[in-house]
Structures are given as C-alpha cells and as structure tokens.
C-alpha cells in the first residue's frame, strides 16, 4: 500500500480530482497549504506599501492506494496539474504500514481505494 501526496496549484484541483476520479479513485484528502521551492515568493503592493510574500498558497492532496495503482494515479495527477510553468508542484509516494476504516473496521487493502481503471490514451 502507498500514500500518494501531491502539492499542486490551487486552480488545478478540480482538473486533478476529475482525472483521478476517471480512474476510479473514490476518495482523497485535500488540505490548503503554503510553501515555496524554486518559485520562491513574490512581492505584492498593499495600501501603497510593498511587502514580500514568502510562502505561496498550494493544495495538498493525499490518496491511499494499492501498489498496483501508483503509476496510473501519478500519471493522471501529472497530466492534470501541468501548466509548464514554475510552481506546478511535486508528487511524493510513501509506504503505508497499516490502514483502518474506522466505521467498518476494514483493514489495509479493503480500507483504501479500489483498483483503478488503466489509463487509455484519448483517440
């Protein structure tokens, strides 16, 4: 089992959600986060005063899935989040030791998203 964490631009969230939903991913956790990388911050003007914004708003999404689904989900996120500009984001993949669905007591593979549909190239 794996946990896929993606940091993306906020305006790309709907595109990414639709892309992974098309694969059959039926759940994810979304958090509003701030950060910077190569993009750094930027300068803004507010009431005539200039100030530096060091941390930029981003969205983090987490998807728990089986090992077999990882590459398809990464590909879907990468395509949907892509703008070609600095700050598109990053995808991290972590090992999951144990998962429990609180409501039912289901564990591990039964408690995470079902197998995804293979990605088919549009014709």
PLM feature spans:
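Positively charged, small/polar-rich N-terminal and surface patches that mediate targeting and assembly
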Residues: 1-123
């Amino acid at each position: 089992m794996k946990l896929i964490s993606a940091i993306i631009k906020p305006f790309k969230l709907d595109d990414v959600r639709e892309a992974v939903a098309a694969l059959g991913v039926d759940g994810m956790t979304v958090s509003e986060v701030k950060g910077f990388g190569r993009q750094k911050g930027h300068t803004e003007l507010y009431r005539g005063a200039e100030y530096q914004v060091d941390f930029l708003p981003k969205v983090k999404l987490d998807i728990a899935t089986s090992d077999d689904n990882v590459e398809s989900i990464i590909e879907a996120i990468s395509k949907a989040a892509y703008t070609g500009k600095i700050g598109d984001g990053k995808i991290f993949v972590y090992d999951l030791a144990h998962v429990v669905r609180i409501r039912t007591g289901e564990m591990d593979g039964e408690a995470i998203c079902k197998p995804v549909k293979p990605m088919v190239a549009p014709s």
